[in-house]
Amino acid sequence: MKKKTMAFMAGTMILGAILSGCGVKEDNTQSTLSSSSEVSQTEASPSSEAAQSSALSTGYPITIETKGSDFITVEQTYNEAPDRAVTANASSIELFYNLGLSDRIVGTIAIDNAPGDDWKELYDSLNILGDKMTISKEVIAAAEPDVIIGRSATFAEGTFGSIPELNELGINVYAQKASDMSTDVSMQSIIDDVTTLGKIFNVQDKANAYAKTLTERLNTVSEKVAASAGDKTLNVLVMATYKEGTFVVFGANAKLQNGMLSALNCVNVMNKGGSSLTLENLVEANPDVIIYVTADRNAESDAKAVESMKNEEILASVPAVANNKIIEVPYDAFMDYGVRNFDTLEELSDFLYN
């Protein structure tokens, strides 16, 4: 199902903002492209001085398709590069940092875990608008952003606001393609997010160069896995919050993470996520590998989780425990939707196949 957001009708002040900046445009002649498609762009005229370089320039207006928590496709039109952005998760902050767009961030939603070392200073300098449990669309609107970036599930009616609700406030939305739970996604989806943001913000050269680096990293992992794994598939259990013999799992319905496992020739032994699983469930799952996802809020229990599993006699025959194939990864480096996932992919590749 697809719907097109309409021009705002809230008054001359909002209308003026739409006409001068980013907005949803009611123009049937405007070409519509998905976030993974080519957006119309122009190169500098050969007769101009700018044509001496290979710089790509976005031709505005452009229309990008995106999806909120209902996974209905919504079109977002940008009449110019956004000047003011709100980031809604750690991976969107990191994307802005790597694309040289840090100065466009006018506010962010507080993140759950410590920021990455390379962008910690940036995060510490940002205006924290609130946390994900209490933030409201009115607070977001008060920061006067042109656009907000985050995962699809964030954009729901209620506190944060659906895409149409935010559009009515004069705010465009870009939901990360890598966070789309309605379809199969992969590490390529993160690369697509990089190039699409490059088009939206008119930093295509930087985005394309960064995307090339990520593609090369992905190809290196793929070649290593193909050479090392052959036809062998590893059964993996993705676990978190291990306490006194119970734990949480993330299942194959976590689409990006499932795509990461597929790239490593691995299969998630759990179809869906769940909580309050027991040691008996772990024995029954019989994984070759356990990926243990750590989080700051579980720091105390996480510190002893792996050792506790190894000391459980009932788990002695589980291959992951018997062969010491348990690896810890930070939540935001595995369960988020950004470039840190590439670090984790490489770490997992080394752990599994070295």
What are the functions of these language-model segments?
Residues 91-94, 111-114, 147, 153-157, ...:
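Solvent-exposed loop/turn segments at secondary-structure junctions
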Residues 2-4, 8, 20-94, 200-238, ...:
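Bacterial Sec-exported substrate-binding components of ABC uptake systems
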Residues 77, 136-147, 278-286:
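Short helices/loops that flank or line small-molecule/ion binding pockets
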Residues 11-18:
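Bacterial N-terminal signal peptides
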Residues 84-143, 147, 151-153, 266-269:
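A short, structured surface patch at a secondary-structure boundary
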Residues 184-201, 208, 291-354:
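Structured C-terminal subdomain patch of bacterial secreted/periplasmic proteins
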Residues 111-116, 248-275:
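Alpha-helical, coiled-coil/dimerization segments enriched in small aliphatic residues
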Residues 115-116, 152-161, 171-196, 230-256:
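Extracytoplasmic ligand-binding site segments that recognize negatively charged/polar headgroups
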